[in-house]
Amino acid sequence: MRFWALLLASLCGLTAAARAEVSEVRFAQQFSMGYLQYNVMKHQNLLEKHAALLGVPNLKVTWAVFNGPDMMNDALLSGSVDVVCGGVPGLLTLWAKTHGTANPVRGIAALSQQPVLLVTRNPAVKTIRDFGPGDRIALPAVKVSAQATLLQMAAAKEWGDAQYDRLDSLTFSLSPPDSTTGLLSGNAGFNSVFSVPPFQSLQLRDPAVHVVLDSHDITGPATGGNTWTSARFHDANPRVYQALIAALKEASAFIPGHERETLGYYAEDSKMKMDVAFLAQILEDKRYKYVLKPEAMMTWASFMHRTGRIKVMPASWKDLFWPEIHDMDGS
């Protein structure tokens, strides 16, 4: 009798262990306004709330800030973080790298659409054709960031695919806050910046700075910010993952109509002295959208595959994302 009792207890323990999910979710975020859902989730404890509703109480959520996709993707692969955010190229690069492996990476959802601007204080530069060897362009990460890829897409459009990297030699990596400070100083050794909101708007406050390139001229309305994770996290934590989707949906629904409150969260999290009224003016541009539906992902994928940036071409946007959002009308 005791044998059967011990066996039953053992089986119950195994069942409980199989149901066990993470007690902590570690997020990686960036400086941009492209991930405002993260700020809402953080301040309103949305993931914790939805996890508790699904039977995972006392979930701990932590947040770390990164500049650019390389370090975040390395952290995700090493297991140092669970969920990351970034531009489309960062997701595509890691999706292709892990495609067919035991731990593939896919998108959780899109987060935003927003215009990204290449600006300069060189009055002779009106289009990308005017850049010369004396110009230097700061962007979050050379070759791999969304800005670097957009510059390559613009070069391919201007000079053909064979010269897609024609302007790469002018670029170097610098965080958006530091590139803004340097550009506005006028003596930092570079004269152009391809950045993110709200920093590009801060740069354009200087009358000596003007726009050279708008990302919408290259891709049209397209997803800019995404969030992604590995199979290791997705598969082992079905309830936490379901809570994450619910939290993202609630945060996305909150932003319209609560812009100032949302931007107050962002200003606090960025640890920079930013005027919320100024940030709210940026969002008056209707091209800023905080939606989970992926859009124009295949435009990015086609370019990166055509130029050898990724070795695998997705058949559709659904290949790039976990199934929980496949009911959306994405592209």
Give, region by region, the residue ranges found by the protein language model:
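Short, glycine-/small- and polar/acidic-enriched structural segments
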Residues: E21-Y164, D168-S173, N187, N191-P197, ...
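Secondary-structure end/capping motifs
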Residues: D235-K311
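Solvent-exposed, polar/charged alpha-helical surfaces in well-ordered, non-transmembrane soluble domains
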Residues: D70, D74, S78, L92, ...
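Short, surface-exposed acidic
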Residues: V56-T62, A162-S169, S270-Q281, K311-W317
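Conserved C-terminal helix/tail region of periplasmic/extracytoplasmic solute-binding proteins
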Residues: M304-S331
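Pocket-lining segment of extracytoplasmic ligand-binding domains
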Residues: G160, R166-D168, F172-E268
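Bacterial N-terminal signal peptides
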Residues: A5-L14
